[in-house]
Curated annotation (Swiss-Prot):
GO terms for molecular function: translation elongation factor activity. It comes from Mesomycoplasma hyopneumoniae (strain J / ATCC 25934 / NCTC 10110). PROSITE patterns: EF_TS_2. This is Elongation factor Ts. SUPFAM superfamilies: Elongation factor Ts (EF-Ts), dimerisation domain, UBA-like. The keyword Transcription regulation does not apply. One of its GO terms (cellular component) is cytoplasm.
């Protein structure tokens, strides 16, 4: 290999890893000038700045739901800032990872990270490369994938801003029904899918609260027949539950009927609903910009 070719390789590795010139040169010399092997060498030796970003919090990013004739998938790809999430390199990476995840079988996130692209690079390495190239920590945080049959109606919905993605699997029904449910779940974010999923303790709390409210607000409630009381209480309880139970909620596209009735009218039953929203459950780091600038000034003055 000519000296010019070697310098070109060093330049390329520097652009990818953001590591110093000397370290890039050493990495390539120890890797027979193979870029991928050199990246691994830098990561193992801790010279790559991508590795030094690994302890940062990545709570922004994008989610995406995809399907093919056999499987359906939803996953979350994170960055440190929403600005980077709009970067075309980040968007391209998300699309590539989505294709790899959909085309390959895996049982958990750890297995998913081992899936290789056409060049033999695992997803974990693609994330390291993206971290070095983009300049922020990039992570594949979570993924859900399942197979489905012809008897099921499966549809996906990813909100236009890429912050919310939903998959819906129905027994019976059709794709339009599944799509409407996915859009409903994206908008209202119900905590539970079915009433029977609500914990008994929570149900008992609601029942006691509703009974007190009925005696206080419903005229002559205590004098009404037991069957009338039961009907009033059920209606009040269901109304409160509809704030967080999918099947009891008025359908987002037609508030005249509940999701439960909408499904029944179309001979469909809910089998699985999965909703991902970017950053949910992550404790975001609050950065004091002024303090950060002052710290950098102090460090500079010490030099």
């Amino acid at each position: 290999m000519s000296q010019i070719d070697k310098m070109a390789k060093i330049k390329k590795l520097r652009e990818i890893s953001d590591a110093p010139f000397v370290d890039c040169k050493k990495a390539l010399e120890n890797s027979d000038y193979d870029i991928d092997l050199a990246i691994n060498w830098l990561n193992k030796s801790g010279k790559s700045k991508a590795l030094k970003k690994s302890d940062r919090i990545a709570a922004e990013g994008l989610v995406l739901a995809k399907k093919d004739p056999n499987s359906v998938l939803v996953f979350e790809l994170n960055s440190e800032t929403d600005f980077v999430a709009k970067n075309q390199n980040f968007i391209n990476l998300q699309q590539k990872i989505g294709e790899l995840l959909l085309a390959n079988d895996f049982t958990n996130l750890e297995d998913a990270l081992l899936i290789q692209d056409e060049a033999g690079r695992p997803i974990s390495e693609l994330l390291i490369l993206a971290t070095a190239t983009i300049g922020e920590k990039i992570t594949l945080r979570r993924v859900f994938k399942t197979k489905y049959s012809l008897e099921q109606s499966v549809e996906v919905y990813t909100h236009s801003n890429g912050q919310i993605a939903v998959i819906t699997i129905l027994k019976g029904g059709n794709l339009e029904i599944a799509k409407n449910i996915s859009m409903h779940v994206a908008a209202l974010n119900p905590q539970y899918i079915l009433k029977i999923e609500v914990p008994n303790e929570k149900l008992q709390e609601i029942q006691l609260e509703v009974e007190k409210k009925a005696f206080a607000e419903v005229k002559n409630f205590e004098k009404k027949p037991e069957n009338v009381k039961a009907g009033i209480l059920k209606g009040m309880i269901d109304k409160q539950l509809s704030e967080f139970v999918l099947e009891l909620q008025p359908l987002a596209t037609d508030s005249a009927i509940t999701v439960e009735k909408y499904l029944a009218q179309n001979s469909a039953t809910l089998e699985k609903v999965v909703r991902f929203e970017v950053g949910e459950g992550i404790q975001k780091q609050n950065v004091d910009f002024s303090a950060e600038v002052n710290q950098q000034i102090q460090e500079f003055q010490k030099k």
